[in-house]
Amino acid sequence: MSGSRPTQSSEGSRRSRHSARIIAQTTVDAKLHADFEESGSSFDYSTSVRVTGPVVENQPPRSDKVTTTYLHHIQKGKLIQPFGCLLALDEKTFKVIAYSENASELLTMASHAVPSVGEHPVLGIGTDIRSLFTAPSASALQKALGFGDVSLLNPILVHCRTSAKPFYAIIHRVTGSIIIDFEPVKPYEVPMTAAGALQSYKLAAKAITRLQSLPSGSMERLCDTMVQEVFELTGYDRVMAYKFHEDDHGEVVSEVTKPGLEPYLGLHYPATDIPQAARFLFMKNKVRMIVDCNAKHARVLQDEKLSFDLTLCGSTLRAPHSCHLQYMANMDSIASLVMAVVVNEEDGEGDAPDATTQPQKRKRLWGLVVCHNTTPRFVPFPLRYACEFLAQVFAIHVNKEVELDNQMVEKNILRTQTLLCDMLMRDAPLGIVSQSPNIMDLVKCDGAALLYKDKIWKLGTTPSEFHLQEIASWLCEYHMDSTGLSTDSLHDAGFPRALSLGDSVCGMAAVRISSKDMIFWFRSHTAGEVRWGGAKHDPDDRDDARRMHPRSSFKAFLEVVKTRSLPWKDYEMDAIHSLQLILRNAFKDSETTDVNTKVIYSKLNDLKIDGIQELEAVTSEMVRLIETATVPILAVDSDGLVNGWNTKIAELTGLSVDEAIGKHFLTLVEDSSVEIVKRMLENALEGTEEQNVQFEIKTHLSRADAGPISLVVNACASRDLHENVVGVCFVAHDLTGQKTVMDKFTRIEGDYKAIIQNPNPLIPPIFGTDEFGWCTEWNPAMSKLTGLKREEVIDKMLLGEVFGTQKSCCRLKNQEAFVNLGIVLNNAVTSQDPEKVSFAFFTRGGKYVECLLCVSKKLDREGVVTGVFCFLQLASHELQQALHVQRLAERTAVKRLKALAYIKRQIRNPLSGIMFTRKMIEGTELGPEQRRILQTSALCQKQLSKILDDSDLESIIEGCLDLEMKEFTLNEVLTASTSQVMMKSNGKSVRITNETGEEVMSDTLYGDSIRLQQVLADFMLMAVNFTPSGGQLTVSASLRKDQLGRSVHLANLEIRLTHTGAGIPEFLLNQMFGTEEDVSEEGLSLMVSRKLVKLMNGDVQYLRQAGKSSFIITAELAAANK
């Protein structure tokens, strides 16, 4: 299908389009910034935004002086906000290499209340920072500056030597230097005496608990809760949650304000209102505060001898730019606090962790939590740090909601497939418009129409019959060879009468079911979906559209999207395309329909029989696994009567299966656990499945003297075929041994060292921290598990140094795991009950450990919290053995990869020699034919180099490969591809002919020519291999250009490789299409080539005819404009 955007695209091409859009948007941002700086007070916001227009995704990025100057201005600004001061130090000598002009006044001025002794220190270039502060403060700074990740210790409380005034020192590293922001501790503020994340987390404990307790399934509820908690935590006049949409425009999705302020809920604003450069900085600095937009900024003076410009991007004091200050002033906002919400990209990640190279998920800026105040407002760094952590917790929940949305998309696809099958049973095609459900139920739309045998059937909001006929004629004239069109703007797609359709019809998806018959789906303009909850203005109160103001932004956004609808999703186009194929191939006449219907019912019945047999086999296997499992598993029916009791639970309790079956479960648990189990049963029977619930179960007969068994259980609702809950299954962990150890901790009243240092193998791995987050305990079992001795971790920050995502003793899998560990530790300090969660980390030796973490607070004799204890419960021996086998397989794969890397490296050396020799030859006098041959050789060398760079075959297969776009001609590609099979074809006397027209061969295209060359060479070689001696291979190509908008042309390329003989074996073609698990080398080569073609929004077909067969390769490229 053709369209204003590709209807089917891989993850790699989606990322490429997104990257190109960001680059293009940055250019637009730069121009707006330059216009603002040049125009001053005469800057016309609305006109400027309208002139820039929407960013075109397929437009090649450009780099110009305006953009470069803009980015340098953003990154290398030399101004800070005056509420604090800044020093930059040489990393080796701790001497000042830059300082803000207000630093001397804040850090060295004597206080009248504090008598000064000795000379006052002088602040300037070359000053040793330690001379400015008291001895304990200087010592603390020196210790922190020698720390690996200095940000872990922020903030550091220091006192000035002359005035004894307290400051928070906030440190970060940049290339070649250390930047320290000094923020004064306000008189009303209780100074934070201990550094580290755990201290700041306490400030947000209530808000975190509230977020954690929210049920999933509502992004709106999550955002509303977040802004309410931030509103209460920070005290700002207005708190908003911004969400960035796919096209980078923003929307206020939640808001809380103090009475009397105009609400901005529902506001949409153009992408330019928050420039891409600012978004990049938000990804780096996740919290940004502006204290007073009217304050005069302080300059930063740097040593003139420095060979580089200092960047203040990481500084908490960095001054906002004038354009943003003007925007705030127009909103009557004096102060702001912004928190970035950074989430994972929506791509897959392998479940099996790698000990050496664990790939991190790509991150993206989902949105912002923005606080505004009508008066100057300062938030101390500890509270800002707590807000940052709260934003990270919020981001984790946003991730989960996005994943749930993706699951809903999958359900929609399944629903669509059901609808398609339902339509398949009808009298096509009229049944798809005359019955229910109909084609409007297939995808979200405002209207749909069927043009069939020169008659029109309409549903919902559609153009008139006259306009529908005009659209059909336009498609036949301008998109004659395409099977359909999808666009979010008929105006931009080039339909002449698009504006006459009005706002009700902007976007369209259309497909052909025959040469004259079509189906249409229509969407109204985006603004129709937008509702701003802002206050209505008085008719006489008119906004100045030239000012940057929310209402102006909203109007500018509506101006940009006034001819656009919501874009068509890929899965929606898949559903439309599926319906198109069904109608084109399955319903040629009513007789065929009847036959097909009978065949379908027959197939469905066969599937039911197969499904029952398969279900019986699966059920038998599941029963066997449950019976032999090494963990306790039990089940009850809807009345609470036991109907499942495996060998392990019988062994632990001393109650046999026969004795347990039929008993009410509540009679088998300890009295103290009855209410817990009763609540869990009720919730599970209502469909709410709880996890990590701890209770005690009675023991019987020979086990009775051992006392009750302590279990931590996950509940799973059992459902029948109609999804009704008919029982509950419990999968448990036995925590009896661990509970015994913890009870001993309580009984010995703090004298726990005998247990901590006891090498008894029955004692689980234990570690602990003090109340400030420094590691204070690390028992022998923990040392054995991690490979880290006690002295290596004691007195290190548990969060960041011991467990972290970067340079830590025990590396965690990702940032989400790090945040969750912080939540658990924080909750353990503030709550009554111990926390139990799943936990995983990499040991020093690279082993990935998965376990259950139990955290409980440590109390002194007076009941004061002095830290936390953490216990690990490891997986069973059988599970560890299975993981060990998996790791062995992974190591074998790594060895093979190393061998492959060695071969690739050895190939590169002679390849470099060949390329050098070619360049030497290019410098000599050559004729036209010699130069053509040399160019073909160069293209082949580039192809080989590109293949050697392909380190991850799985990424190619999954479609996660970025294409390298550039201009080329088909003549270059076909010549280089053909040259690679000439040796083989000459050896078999196979003649290769090219029947492509000269115009197509010489047309300039835009795409990844080397990948296209690689694909064609592979298919040509396969064709030659299966062509008999003396046979022929014919190459032909056609090119169709579709106009997308006013300046972009889409080039639909089709190449046919026709060869004589019986053709490619069927099993190889199955391997190419991925329908067989065992793939040969030839099959893998075909499959990879097809995946590369699909990255170009194309595909490969194989057509068999009498005495000959053809590869038909299609690809979507851009037609380069000269």
UniProtKB/Swiss-Prot annotation:
Tell me what happens on changing Y242H: Constitutively active in the Pfr form, leading to a constitutively photomorphogenic (cop) phenotype and reduced accumulation in the nucleus
Subunit text: Homodimer. Interacts with NDPK2 and PKS4. Stabilized by interactions with PAPP5 and FYPP3 which are enhanced in the phosphorylated Pfr form. Interacts with COP1/SPA1 complex. Binds, via its photosensory domain, to PTAC12/HMR when photoactivated; this interaction stimulates its localization to photobodies. Interacts with FHY1, FHL and FHY3, especially upon far-red (FR) light illumination; when underphosphorylated. Forms PHYA/FHY1/HFR1 complex. Binds to PIF3/PAP3.
Residue spans of biased composition, Polar residues class: 1-11
**When the coding gene is removed by deletion, what phenotypic consequences does the entry describe?**
Blind to far-red (FR). Impaired inhibition of hypocotyl elongation and cotyledons expansion under continuous FR light conditions.
MF annotations from Gene Ontology: far-red light photoreceptor activity; identical protein binding; mRNA binding; phosphorelay sensor kinase activity; protein homodimerization activity; protein kinase activity; red or far-red light photoreceptor activity
Task: Name the source's superkingdom.
Answer: Eukaryota
Asked if the keyword Phosphoprotein belongs to this entry, the reply reads yes
Instruction: Supply the induction statement.
Output: Induced by cold.
Provide the protein's localization: Cytoplasm; Nucleus, Nucleoplasm; Nucleus speckle
Pinpoint the GAF domain residues: 218-402
Relate the outcome reported for changing A30V: In phyA-5; reduced binding to FHY1 and FHL leading to a reduced nuclear import under low fluences of far-red light (FR) light
Is ATP-binding set as a keyword in this record?
Answer: no
Q: What is this protein called?
A: Phytochrome A
Ranges where the record places region Disordered: 1-21
Describe the location of the PAS domain by residue ranges. Answer: 618-688, 748-822
Question: What is the tissue specificity?
Answer: Expressed in fruits, flowers, leaves, stems, seedlings and roots.
> Residue ranges of the PAC domain?
695-747
Q: Which residues form the Histidine kinase domain?
A: 902-1119
Name the residues that bind phytochromobilin.
Answer: C323
What's the family? Answer: Belongs to the phytochrome family.
Lineage of the organism:
Eukaryota, Viridiplantae, Streptophyta, Embryophyta, Tracheophyta
Q: Please describe what this protein does.
A: Regulatory photoreceptor which exists in two forms that are reversibly interconvertible by light: the Pr form that absorbs maximally in the red region of the spectrum and the Pfr form that absorbs maximally in the far-red region. Photoconversion of Pr to Pfr induces an array of morphogenetic responses, whereas reconversion of Pfr to Pr cancels the induction of those responses. Pfr controls the expression of a number of nuclear genes including those encoding the small subunit of ribulose-bisphosphate carboxylase, chlorophyll A/B binding protein, protochlorophyllide reductase, rRNA, etc.
Query: Which consequence is recorded for altering C323A?
Result: Unable to bind the chromophore and cannot be converted to Pfr, fails to accumulate in the nucleus and to interact with FHY1
User: What does altering G727E do?
Assistant: In HY8-3; no regulatory activity
Tell me what PTMs the record reports for this protein.
Phosphorylated.
- Additional record remark: PHYA association with FHY1 and FHY3 protect underphosphorylated PHYA from being recognized by the COP1/SPA complex.
